[in-house]
Regions:
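Alpha4 helix (beta4-alpha4-beta5 surface) of REC/receiver domains from two-component response regulators
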Residues: 1-10
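A Lys-centered signature of the CheY-like receiver
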Residues: 14, 126, 199
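Conserved nucleotide-binding and Mg2+-coordinating catalytic segments in signaling enzymes
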Residues: 46-65, 87-101, 109
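Short regulatory alpha-helical coupling segments
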Residues: 46-47, 58-80, 112-119, 137
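Hydrophobic framework residues that shape the active-site pocket
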Residues: 88, 92, 111, 127, ...
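Active-site-proximal alpha-helical element of nucleotidyl cyclase-like catalytic domains
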Residues: 103-123, 131, 150
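A short pre-motif secondary-structure segment
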Residues: 123-126, 167
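Catalytic-core segments of nucleotide cyclases and related cyclic-nucleotide turnover enzymes
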Residues: 145, 163, 176-209
Length: 209
């Protein structure tokens, strides 16, 4: 039985007795358990490496790797253009000041869930405190403006419960198409500049140029 536990279960003498058969069954079950546990641990490690622990959406590394991949694909195969949305929750500091960090965390989770649902098959991630980026490759027959407007309205419609309160928020965004630039760094920088313009221009809007 000890040899079986050490991996000799496939080399058994004949005839077999009940003790040996039981030991083989136990060894087989143990092997299946450890294989399943190994797969679970690998999934957990992958999840930790690719997602934001608070919101469950992709983290900064995944988002920027995807941007690089999209640019590489476009250069190699003349892939259709894609867009980047750089987004920021309006007045988030005031939310933290009013409701504390637990309230702010609830807002971040609610916005992340809304963006994930609104963006569907597209990549969306949290890249900073209250900052999010979406990479739009598929708009499902919408114009880019219609797509962004649906995101903006989805966030406005949120009424986030926290303790005895309902927190209402808006979001601002800067938008850029891949056809406007030649490299990844410029791509992100211009989107951030447009986000800043959206903030300066009154918030609760997306800027496209």
């Amino acid at each position: 039985a000890k040899c079986i536990k050490l991996g000799a279960s496939d080399y058994l003498p004949k005839p077999l007795n009940g003790t040996i058969l039981m030991a083989k069954s136990i060894a087989s079950l143990e092997a299946k358990y450890f294989r399943a546990r190994e797969q679970e641990l690998l999934k957990e490690l992958n999840l930790k490496a690719t997602t934001c622990p608070l919101t469950g959406i992709y983290n900064r590394q995944v988002v920027f790797d995807k941007i690089e991949e999209c640019f590489d694909d476009q250069k190699k195969s003349n892939k259709k253009e894609f867009a980047l949305l750089s987004m920021d929750i309006d007045f988030f500091k005031s939310i933290n000041d009013t409701y504390g960090h637990p309230g702010g965390d609830e807002v971040l989770k609610a916005v992340a869930n809304t963006l994930r649902e609104a963006c569907g098959e597209n990549i969306v991630g949290r890249v900073g405190g209250e900052e999010f980026i979406a990479i739009i490759e598929s708009k499902k027959d919408k114009t880019l403006e219609e797509y962004c407007e649906s995101i903006r309205k989805s966030v406005i419609d949120l009424s986030i419960p926290f303790q005895d309160n309902k927190i209402n928020i808006t979001i601002s965004g800067g938008v850029i198409k891949s056809s406007e630039v030649k490299d990844q760094e410029e791509f992100v920088n211009i989107a951030d500049e447009r986000l800043y313009k959206a903030k300066e221009g009154g918030r609760n809007q997306f800027i496209y140029s």
